[in-house]
Amino acid sequence: MPKCQFVDPNEARKPGKLSFKDIDLNQYNKTIAEEKKNFSTEDFMRIYHDMAVIREFETMLYSIKTKSEYNGIEYSNPGPAHLSMGQEASAVGQAYLLGIDDYTFGSHRSHSEILAKSLSSINKLSDDELMKIMENFIGGRTLRAVEKLGKVDSVKELAIRFILYGTLSEIFARQNGFHMGLGGSMHAFFLPFGVYPNNAIVGGSAPIATGAALYKKVNRKNGIVVCNAGDGSLGCGPVYEAMNFAAMDQFRTLWEGDMNGGMPILFNVFDNSYGMGGQTRGETMAYDMLARLGAGITPSQMHAERIDGFNPLAVIDAMERKLKLLRNGEGPVLLDTITYRYSGHSTSDQNAYRSKEELDAWKEYDPMVTYRKALVDAKVADDGKFDDIVAETVERMTMICRH
């Protein structure tokens, strides 16, 4: 205790009532036409492109895990694969506004988070910056392997191949992986883009990310920290401990000068309704609405909000507002991001705990379909443009997988 604080018995024993504010649930309702003043055609299409890259990456892994082949390429990989097909919009929306100085720590199924943050970084960095990163990373070994794939027409395309090849090689335990294959699927990361590891321990990123946020705070470092977790992690004590640590009163009451203020950390929960085979809401958890938990942590209720993770623009809208709070010293923040995984907990999961009717109902809101349709209807681009992106994405992924 650095300071002695008087605990007033009269204040402690005073009668009264606690009051709580309303917590917003899925309040975003803007149309594409309304968003055209905030996003260019290139912006809209880049969001779709990044979602398509992630979907194809996960589709490729699913095919290899279940059929030992992808587009005629035979390969067997016995390692784990926790896929995020269906969660692309949540990951891309989150990463869209984040910079290199913003760190993301992954959830239990973090391929989409790794790729989304990396693709966002590639878009923001200059060609010279990208080349320097690729040339200097592990002595340029991964870059040299990527350059052998064939000619490219831009540095950014080279960087996209680099991140896909390095991530896939890491998952397949190959030496050209970002960490020589030692991390694998559950511990893949790429620090030059602010992508920190995910964790095989459910909820394990929460205390680690909180430590990173404390590091940024005490050392006056730029950027914020995003702790990603699944809704299943809310049954784990370290997650609550991390949120409490990040929200300690002393940051606002005892720390002085420019050090006064909350921790720069956003606890984002990818709320896909399941923790392995257990249904969280209505079965294994007690919160009913996950965003409610913020009310039990801080008087500000952690600025908690429930958002539609099937709409990347809704996620970007929420991230913009929450980033302002964090940069103004008003953290921590809690986001309950609704999403859904179309594959099982892992590729060996038979999905016995959910019905085909449920899966089909959620697939009607597949972000790859609904976001594309919204852009076509708003005349941002025609179907041919989207078909070209998909074809290019499949061709690139096939080339990388073959090598």
PLM region spans:
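Cofactor-/ligand-binding subdomain signature composed of acidic, glycine-rich
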Residues: 1-78, 100, 124-136, 140-146, ...
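Conserved thiamine diphosphate
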Residues: 220-221, 286-321, 364-392
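Structured core elements
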Residues: 82, 105, 266-268, 306, ...
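Glycine/aspartate-rich loop-and-adjacent alpha/beta segment that forms the canonical ThDP
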Residues: 1-27, 324-403
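Glycine-rich beta-alpha junction loops
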Residues: 111-112, 271-274, 311, 337-344, ...
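Structural signal for hydrophobic packing residues in well-ordered secondary-structure cores
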Residues: 52-59, 98, 102, 168-176, ...
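Hydrophobic alpha-helical scaffolding
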Residues: 34-37, 80-84, 154, 158, ...
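Cofactor-binding active-site loop characterized by glycine-rich and histidine/acidic residues
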Residues: 63, 72-265, 276-301
